[in-house]
């Protein structure tokens, strides 16, 4: 009976052997996969620390021994790879490699930019304020001008007059307004002040201001003003200047100089007034011209008396 079932037992043994071989192959594949995963974790930048590394895989199932008599090793047939021969001709030479020539890029010449001169606008000249006739002003305004501007207001303009009027009318009490009031009170009580021109009154104010620190009280100031008024000529004493008479006298002096042999001296006197002839000398300079000519003639007379 054992002989009769021998083929069946052999087949069962063969099947059992194949199952063991398949089991061993799965075990090896599983081990290989675990090894690959371990290698991958070792090269991973996010690899855990040494303490957290997983322990190497330990096989839980031991491979079952296989009877050597029943192990059938599969035959692996290795077919030779087809050899592809590359036929090359002896005359074939590698084509020479020609380096591409780089085109020269012409450098753009940059010329220095010309300096642009800034536009300078002509300075705007402020219009000169129109002058004001000082004779048209009141005594109070003349006094205020003398205190505020001094000799700069000899020929006042509209701006100065406006400030003088505003300061005199101001109710604010300070050193300037106090001095204006004191000077005005000292002059306003003098009767002769009304006969003076405003120009003379302005000069009188300047002289009083120059001695202001030595004048105490309205009485001393008024007495000082009266003393100055006595030195000034009254309007009746002032005679108008006859420029025609002065020019005739100057002409006579030139004639005397030329006849006396002082032609060069006469020309020098004319040149000192930027004039080539007597008509070029202004009326204001006629008196000085006569004095210089008279000085030369006087020197001539003194030399003649010595001879």
Swiss-Prot record:
Q: What is this protein called?
A: Putative protein p53
* Organism name: Acyrthosiphon pisum secondary endosymbiont phage 1 (Bacteriophage APSE-1)
Q: Which domain of life is it from?
A: Viruses
Basic and acidic residues bias locations: 44-53
Q: Where is this region: Disordered?
A: 44-64, 109-129
């Amino acid at each position: 009976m054992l002989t009769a079932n021998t083929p069946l037992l052999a087949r069962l043994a063969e099947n059992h052997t194949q199952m063991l071989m398949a089991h061993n192959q799965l075990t090896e594949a599983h081990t290989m996969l675990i090894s690959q995963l371990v290698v991958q974790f070792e090269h991973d930048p996010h690899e855990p620390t040494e303490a957290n590394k997983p322990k190497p895989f330990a096989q839980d199932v031991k491979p079952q021994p296989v009877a050597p008599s029943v192990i059938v090793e599969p035959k692996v047939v290795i077919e030779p790879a087809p050899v592809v021969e590359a036929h090359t001709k002896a005359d074939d030479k590698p084509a020479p490699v020609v380096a591409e020539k780089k085109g020269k890029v012409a450098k753009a010449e940059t010329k220095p930019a010309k300096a642009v001169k800034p536009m300078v606008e002509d300075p705007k000249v402020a219009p000169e304020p129109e002058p004001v006739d000082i004779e048209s002003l009141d005594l109070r305004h003349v006094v205020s001008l003398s205190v505020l501007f001094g000799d700069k207001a000899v020929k006042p303009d509209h701006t100065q007059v406006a400030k003088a009027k505003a300061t005199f009318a101001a109710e604010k009490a300070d050193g300037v307004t106090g001095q204006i009031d004191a000077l005005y009170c000292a002059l306003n009580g003098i009767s002769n002040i009304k006969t003076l021109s405003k120009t003379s009154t302005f000069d009188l104010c300047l002289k009083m201001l120059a001695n202001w620190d030595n004048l105490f009280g309205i009485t001393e100031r008024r007495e000082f003003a009266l003393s100055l008024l006595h030195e000034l000529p009254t309007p009746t004493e002032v005679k108008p200047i006859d420029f025609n008479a002065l020019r005739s006298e100057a002409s006579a002096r030139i004639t005397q100089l030329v006849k006396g042999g002082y032609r060069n001296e006469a020309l020098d006197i004319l040149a000192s007034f930027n004039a080539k002839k007597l008509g070029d000398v202004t009326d204001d300079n006629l008196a000085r011209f006569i004095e210089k000519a008279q000085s030369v003639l006087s020197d001539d007379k003194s030399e003649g008396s010595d001879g």
